[in-house]
Amino acid sequence: MAALWLQSVSLLVLMLVSWSGSQAVLPPQHLCGAHLVDALYLVCGERGFFYTPKRDVDPLLGFLPAKSGGAAAGGENEVAEFAFKDQMEMMVKRGIVEQCCHKPCNIFDLQNYCN
């Protein structure tokens, strides 16, 4: 409960300082889950915002057929499952969760997601 109060107060201070035109720079903050959504509501106001959290795929894995064979099992014409994993990770576009939860962000980063 205290963490929620502290997070809300720090976000409110961040917003008040930035809206007042002050030149004071507050450090960026990590905002995740409900805190991130609340921050977007406060920053974007009536304009609204674009936020689509990724769906958890673990429950869906039970519906997929199990792989049989493969390069490890002697499939000569099959490519290793994770051969291009590094290249694919570099191509993933950073979303608001990556920008504000995994890394700290500021109010200007949040404003980029307003409609």
UniProtKB/Swiss-Prot annotation:
Propeptide residue span(s): 56-92
Alphabetic keyword roster: Carbohydrate metabolism, Cleavage on pair of basic residues, Disulfide bond, Glucose metabolism, Hormone, Secreted, Signal
PROSITE patterns recorded: INSULIN
UniProt cross-references to InterPro entries, sorted A to Z: Insulin, Insulin-like, Insulin-like_sf, Insulin_CS, Insulin_family
Major localization class: secreted
PANTHER family: INSULIN (PTHR11454:SF9), INSULIN/INSULIN GROWTH FACTOR (PTHR11454)
GO annotation terms (biological process): glucose metabolic process
Subcellular location(s) per record: Secreted
Cysteine pairs bridged by disulfides in the record: C32-C101, C44-C114, C100-C105
Annotated function: Insulin decreases blood glucose concentration. It increases cell permeability to monosaccharides, amino acids and fatty acids. It accelerates glycolysis, the pentose phosphate cycle, and glycogen synthesis in liver.
GO cellular component: extracellular space
Protein name (database record): Insulin
Gene expressing this chain: ins
One Pfam short name: Insulin
Organism: Verasper moseri
Signal peptide: 1-22
Record family assignment: Belongs to the insulin family.
